[in-house]
UniProtKB/Swiss-Prot annotation:
This is NAD--protein ADP-ribosyltransferase modB. One of its GO terms (molecular function) is NAD+-protein-arginine ADP-ribosyltransferase activity. Transmembrane segments: none annotated. It catalyses: L-arginyl-[protein] + NAD(+) = N(omega)-(ADP-D-ribosyl)-L-arginyl-[protein] + nicotinamide + H(+).
């Protein structure tokens, strides 16, 4: 389900209904087993487990769809170290499932404020796994017992479900299976008014 940020709270309220949850669960189960749903759920946290990447890779390869032409990734220090000496035309692999976003602001925020690398991967691709869409369905299909309620929930709104959906909708995450990337250009660019200059690696998937 494609969700707009403005619709999150209303959908969260609807998702408190057992009937709504069951209808969404049937929809989700047409695509993913319970185990696969569990793997995707764990990806809302940092994906540091090698076994998780193995299972995740198998899942997303079965569900690749047409993606936006351009995706972005603000890279970690380990990835920056991996590619720092590479030149245009060279190939590299992170040996893991990589998350990208359609949101340039999100990618810049991760690179600038979380990883402190000021380095962006800009990927041109025609297919990827729409994690944001699929995990939104899973969140909406989940029973109320999966989420914490807070004392501020005076209207019965499940704030943790809402918070999770807000995060997912803002990040607009897409995933690329484990594989190789080819560097097509390297540049210094000011990508967003809220940030300074970034080192940008334009890349493409090597089939």
């Amino acid at each position: 389900m494609i969700i707009n940020l403005a619709d999150v709270e209303q959908l969260s309220i609807k998702a408190e209904s057992v009937d709504f949850q069951y209808d969404m669960y049937k929809k989700v189960c047409e695509k993913f087993t319970d185990f696969e749903q569990s793997v995707l759920w764990q990806c809302m946290e940092a994906k540091k487990n090698e076994a998780l990447h193995k299972h995740l890779n198998e899942i997303i390869k079965k569900h690749l769809t047409k993606s936006p032409y351009q995706l972005y990734r603000g890279i970690s220090k380990s990835t920056k170290e991996l590619i720092k000496d590479l030149q245009v035309g060279e190939v590299f692999s992170t040996n893991r499932v990589d998350s990208f976003t359609t949101s340039l602001h999100t990618a810049c925020s991760f690179s600038y404020a979380e990883y402190f690398t000021e380095t962006i991967l800009r990927l041109k691709t025609d297919k990827a796994f729409n994690y944001s869409d699929h995990i939104s369905d899973i969140i909406l299909s989940s029973p109320n017992t999966e989420f914490k309620y807070t004392y501020e929930d005076t209207d019965g709104l499940d704030s943790e479900r809402t918070d999770n959906l807000m995060m997912i909708v803002r990040e607009q995450e897409w995933m690329i299976p484990i594989g190789k990337y080819k560097i097509t250009s390297i540049s210094k660019e000011k990508l967003h008014d809220s940030f300074g200059t970034f080192k940008v690696y334009d890349i493409e998937v090597v089939e």
